[in-house]
Regions:
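Glycine- and aromatic-enriched mobile tails/lids
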Residues: 32, 126-142, 152-153, 206-208, ...
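An anion/pyrophosphate-binding glycine-rich loop and adjacent beta-alpha core
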Residues: 83, 89-198, 249-250, 259-265, ...
Length: 367
């Protein structure tokens, strides 16, 4: 992934037909009289700019920044999803959020990861008393699926027993050589994983839902495509497999580029529009805490109703900011899905229904 990013940035900077606007913030999608997307309103250098485009491609990342503990950059907090909702796009499966079970719990934002490869090498999850606990939750132990391990760790933390990843016997002195990134994160926090267990906690990691697209990246709005984590291609179902998001981003980005290259869209001219409301820093912290408490690894109706009330209060104070719209979509879909499936776990509906069904909604459905 890092090498793909490096080479793409290098190629983009070298391409004379690409203008790079670093530090620009997308504010809203602009539309013509027919509802087709005609460009973007952005803020760059303290000024607002209208960017016209025959085709606008959203690649804004996920929603991890809507949660108090996340592995995502804090800037990735559902803005693309919210902008698409505000423009009338169809959203799919927003309730499905994957939580990485073993973020290193050292108070950093974003939280560094203790990779699953550590458990693959034999590291065990233990409580504060040093006793392993995964066998009590699932016969597959440390190698159970991500959502199962994340819920087990959350339950142990909620019960006051804590959760730690013990790598001392399985990896020991070889830690710095085999897992240098994790080792550096631990040492920076004053933890030597060769000698001490690593404190861990679940963290919002990947959003399986997003802006509905077809197999060529088209959304339900003319002139708008979406790719990467902000898109809902259906490729990940209810629970993404590790590393598949990289494959999805590469494949669907190439398909969008091929489509646009082979079938040039008609030129569009975007008209200026006012900037939408923005969620202030205090409101964002309130939302992140509420999302973590009530739409995390285990959900129930009382918690989701409490979250809906919090979101409504924030919208009354700040207006329909993109983050608020994204959170509303997730909360409503989670309330309506009365089952547990993949990254969506309802403790009041623990069974999985025999027939699978996707969730679809628009801004109109949010009321």
């Amino acid at each position: 992934g890092r090498e793909i990013m490096r080479s793409l940035v290098e190629a983009a900077r070298a391409c004379p037909s690409i203008e790079v606007m670093e530090g620009a913030q997308a504010l809203r999608l602009l539309q013509d009289g027919s509802g087709a997307v005609s460009g973007l309103l952005v803020r760059h250098g303290g000024q607002e700019h209208v960017l016209s485009a025959a085709e606008t491609v959203l690649a804004t990342g996920g929603i991890g920044g809507l949660y108090r503990v996340t592995t995502n950059p804090p800037e990735a907090r559902g803005q693309g999803l919210g902008m698409a909702l505000a423009a009338g796009a169809l959203i799919a499966d927003p309730e499905f959020v994957q939580f990485h079970p073993t973020a290193i719990d050292i108070g950093r934002d974003p939280a560094p990861l203790a990779t699953e490869a550590l458990r693959g090498e034999g590291a065990t999850l233990i409580g504060r008393d040093g006793a392993p606990f995964m066998a009590r939750h699932d016969p597959r132990g440390e190698l159970a699926p991500r959502d199962v391990v994340a819920r087990a760790i959350a339950a142990e933390i909620a019960a006051g027993r804590g959760a730690f990843l013990d790598c001392r016997s399985a990896i020991g002195a070889g830690f710095p050589d085999h897992f240098p990134t994790v080792f550096a994160a631990c040492v920076a926090a004053g933890i030597d994983p060769r000698l001490q267990p690593i404190p861990v906690a679940p963290a919002a990691h990947y959003h399986m839902g997003g802006i509905l697209t077809d197999l060529w990246g088209r959304t339900t709005l003319e002139g708008l495509s979406a790719v990467g984590e902000c898109a809902a291609t259906g490729a990940h179902g209810a629970n993404r497999l590790a590393s598949n998001s990289l494959l999805e981003a590469v494949v669907f980005a190439d398909r969008i580029a091929t489509r646009l290259r082979e079938g040039a869209s008609a030129a569009r001219t975007a008209q200026p529009a006012p900037a939408p409301p923005e969620l202030g820093a205090e409101g964002l912290q309130t939302l992140r805490a509420a999302m973590a408490a009530d739409a995390g690894v285990a959900r129930d109706r009382p918690g989701l109703m409490r979250l809906a009330d919090t979101i409504a209060a924030l919208e009354a104070s700040y207006g329909p900011a993109s983050e608020i719209l994204a959170a509303r979509a997730l909360c409503q879909a989670a309330l309506h899905r009365e089952e547990s499936r993949g990254g969506h776990a309802r403790i009041d509906f623990p069974a999985t229904k025999a027939s699978a069904a996707r969730s679809f909604l628009t801004l109109h459905d949010l009321g």
